[in-house]
Regions:
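A contiguous strand-loop segment
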Residues: 20-117, 137-301
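Accessory, solvent-exposed terminal regions and/or long lumenal/extracellular loops of proteins
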Residues: 264-352, 356-358, 463-464
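Histidine-centered catalytic/metal-binding microenvironments
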Residues: 447-550
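Conserved short S/T/G-enriched processing/targeting/catalytic segments and their helical context
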Residues: 118-122
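Substrate-recognition/cap regions that form aromatic- and gly/pro-loop-enriched pockets
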Residues: 330-468
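Positively charged n-region of N-terminal signal peptides that target proteins for export
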Residues: 1-4
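Bacterial N-terminal signal peptides
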Residues: 7-15
């Protein structure tokens, strides 16, 4: 019997609560017909990486050993006859799966299950040619071997369709999971941010006898026992027609709306009438009695570009009622970043909180997955990727048709405990951690470098994709691998240049003039503190710093 140890696509550690964000765009909602899904993978204390698993045809009787990214005993399961190549979280057929954790009812976690959510995603990508197939593969695997993570939402997408799937286990000693998956209408957008969001869903009149799942007009799928199990556990007692998955398995509370649904709200607000979305502000305060909940999806006012989505991944509620740069807690440099924890107490015991935006310093990696049915798979699927906070990096195009990963993104070069200039994670963090403490003074230099790179990639990709049509499959794989490595090297060089600029330009808390990424001759200036901070200092210190009249 042949055995293979499964290599995970990313190295992960346990992440903090309220971690990870997904934005999802249907093909008719995007400007060019792309299906788009994104992933900010957030959590302190881990460095992400980009992995690659090669395609393969496997012998009968071949086994693979599942080893959870959290450690523990390895379990053997039969290998599939054929497995697809996977780059990051997209396979060679342009199928992508991303996730956010919403936990849900703690008693439903099954520690004896063999599949955690990340291993489940990885195996499904290796075995699925479409999003629909991936959903059914995930269901089959947890039914057979058990599921040991908490409640999860998955965006399961291919070049034609985007699906959202919510899944939670059945508790200790019980294999399987209860789940619902809904197809995102092609002309809509949606988002997930660590809360369960599917409530009522279309249902069949009579469940099939031989299958463990139901399909409703190709737009909804769900486990056959999703309602009966909730009744068994005492989570629901009403009629089937009024059943809400979220209310049964992942009920809302203040944290779920303010730290999670607020991120969805901000994304929607970018793409529809802001005033209409501001009507949901009472919901973000958990005032459920006076305000409706957010819709599951919306139709954007105008079609969405992939660059718009990159910008959305960097959101800190700027320009909204939740703007993090506009009060004293933003500090002297109008920072949208805050230290942990999310919840804290004042010296008098008053309970307080801070906002939790889409863009955050604890991101280990960020990606925007773009699937295009109008291009051949190897070049149609591209993941815009980098390691660290989306706000502080440039997205590097990584084609799904490559055959190896660029060195700076490899796991062995991104050790959380050892700085290296050859590590994308550490080069991006090196720059970000210079900018964080003096945000308003330095962010303009970073945005300039970010835009320069992403503009270049956007233009160069047009040439790459035009040339791809004339190449054989082998030539195309080599070409895309080389171009992806060149793109990554360009990012690393530009970020090294940016780091050197920041220390020279902003040395000793002044600001020297610069042009085209280099310091120029001229008189330095001293950047002013944020007005809100100055006013707060004046109010707090009284007459101490008031200058006398002259």
């Amino acid at each position: 019997m042949k055995r293979i140890i499964l290599t995970l696509i990313f190295s992960l550690a346990a992440t903090a609560g309220y971690a990870c964000t997904n934005l999802i765009v249907g093909k008719a909602a995007s400007k060019d017909g792309s299906v788009i899904c994104t992933y900010n993978c957030d959590g302190f204390g881990f460095s992400g990486s980009l992995g690659y698993s090669a395609p393969g045809r496997h012998e009968k009787g071949e086994m693979i050993a599942l080893r959870s990214w959290g450690g523990g005993e390895a379990h053997l399961i039969p290998q599939a006859e054929y497995t697809y190549a996977v780059v990051g979280l997209m396979n060679e057929k342009q199928v992508s799966i991303v996730e956010t954790t919403w936990d849900g009812r703690s008693e439903l976690r099954n520690p004896e299950g063999w599949f955690d959510y990340f291993t489940l995603m990885n195996i499904a990508l290796q075995r699925s040619a479409t999003a629909r197939e991936a959903i059914l593969v995930m269901d089959a695997l947890v039914q057979e071997y058990g599921y040991n993570s908490t409640g999860e939402s998955f965006a399961v997408c291919d070049k034609d369709e985007a699906w959202i799937m919510e899944l939670i286990g059945k508790g200790p000693g019980r294999k399987g999971a209860v789940w619902v998956a809904r197809r995102l209408p092609d002309d809509c957008i949606t988002a997930y941010a660590n809360s369960s969001r599917i409530r009522r869903f279309p249902q069949v009149r009579k469940a099939p006898k031989k299958l463990g799942y139901c399909v409703v007009e190709g737009e909804c799928m769900y486990s056959k026992d999703v309602i009966s199990f909730a009744r068994e556990m005492g989570y629901y007692s009403g009629p089937d027609s009024e059943f809400s998955f979220r209310e049964a398995y992942g009920p809302l509370n203040f944290g779920k709306v303010r730290y999670c649904e607020a991120r969805v709200w901000s994304f929607f607000r970018h793409h529809t009438d802001p005033a209409a979305m501001d009507a949901y502000l009472p919901f973000l305060e958990a005032r459920f009695d006076v305000c409706d909940e957010l819709p599951l999806w919306i139709r954007p006012d105008s079609k969405v570009d992939v660059r718009d989505i990159m910008s959305d991944m960097r959101d800190h509620y700027e320009g909204t009622a939740l703007d993090m740069t506009a009060d004293m807690s933003a500090g002297p440099w109008a920072s949208p970043y805050r230290n942990q924890p999310v919840n804290f107490e004042a010296s008098d015991g008053t309970k307080m909180f801070r906002e939790r935006p889409i863009g955050c310093q604890q991101s280990g990696m960020t990606m925007v997955c773009r699937m295009r049915s109008f291009l051949p798979d190897p070049v149609g699927g591209v993941t815009y990727f980098n390691l660290d906070d989306a706000s502080m990096v440039a997205y590097v195009p990584v084609y799904c048709g490559i055959s190896s990963v660029p060195e700076p993104f490899r796991r062995e070069n991104n050790d959380i405990n050892e700085f290296s200039t050859g590590s994308a994670f550490w080069m991006c963090n090196f720059v970000a951690n210079m900018v964080y403490p003096r945000y308003s003074a330095m962010i303009g230099d970073l945005r300039e470098a970010q835009k320069e790179l992403e503009d270049f990639y956007e233009q160069d990709q047009k040439e790459v994709e035009a040339r791809a049509a004339g190449l054989t499959r082998g030539e195309l794989s080599d070409y895309l691998t080389r171009k992806t490595s060149e793109y990554t090297a360009r990012m690393m060089a530009r970020w090294d240049k940016l780091a050197r600029l920041l220390i020279v330009k902003h040395n000793d808390q002044i600001m020297r003039p610069s042009e085209n990424g280099a310091v120029t001759r001229g008189r330095h200036t001293s950047p002013a503190y944020a007005p809100a901070f100055i006013d707060a200092v004046k109010a707090h210190t009284g007459p101490r710093y008031l200058r006398p009249a002259e």
